[in-house]
Amino acid sequence: LASSAASDVYKRQHSDCVFLCFTNATLIDEEFCKEVQKLGNLSFSLSLEGFEEANDGRRGQGIFQKVLGAMDLMKRYGLFFGTSVCYTRKNMDAVTSDEFFDLLIEHGCRYSWYFHYMPVGNEADVELMPTMEQREYIYKRIREVRAFEGGKPIMLMDFQNDGEFVGGCIAGGRNYFHINANGDAEPCVFIHYSGANIRENTLLECLQQPLFMAYRDNQPFNDNMLRPCPMLENPEKLQEMVRETGAKSTDLQSPESAEHLCGKCEPYAAEWKEHADKIWAEHPFVKKGYKNYKSEIEGTDAK
């Protein structure tokens, strides 16, 4: 989107769509903001991991100030933007503090995505995964901050704990899927397995690949909407689907087996089940949120 020609693709060819871009914000400058201002259908989620020391420790020296500078520019041009926060065991206190939320609001953020740390990759550090107490806390804290009464003027969305609003996992083409830089059609940005590539297959063929069909046959992966993911909370599900469909790892640097990936999640899933079931049982609106009619007809709707 560095040129007016690229802007035309969004505005003229796809004026009936709204686009959301996740970015580290390092390429956002005044000229860029002027181009985006002409569009009206493009929003940005700027990656931020906490305050300066924590953020730059993960994303590089000086990035925190660049992000704040980009926010101030976008605010000046009246652009609609927010942040993308990955919460971990180490930064949980910071990214859920009043000071952090107030900082985002001060610099013009209208919303913020909160993503649970996923131990994806052969070298992923499982020690960064939140504790059970931390996950319970952020479940309650997000709802507190975005409440109409007593909350703050910013819309917060928790990718892992807001499953109740979308019927659990939306991946695998149910409502969403991911295409990586190589063109591989993956179920989710966190799930690097596929049996189709957009450079070799049509969009419909990508959606009909065996792995995606297995996803849709099995959704929701759990009737407890606080246990939505076939990797993090139901690791046996992803292993089974990858094995039965013959999907291959799409990690170009270091291919990871589903068994290795899900093995890192099994202790977490077992421990979280007790906490999640307790919270869900106390939920005032206990319901699936999504009905898989195919599995119900075939008599397999028991999770």
Q: Can you say where each PLM-predicted feature lies in the sequence?
A:
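Acidic (Asp/Glu)-rich catalytic clusters
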Residues: 11-14, 35-40, 75-76, 104-107
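Short beta-strand/loop segments at the ligand-binding rim of alpha/beta enzyme cores
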Residues: 15-20, 80-81
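Short beta->alpha connector loops
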Residues: 24-28, 89-90
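Radical SAM enzyme [4Fe-4S]-AdoMet core and its adjacent flexible, acidic
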Residues: 47, 56-168, 172, 181-182, ...
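Flexible mid-to-C-terminal extensions adjoining Fe-S/redox cofactors in radical SAM and related proteins
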Residues: 190-303
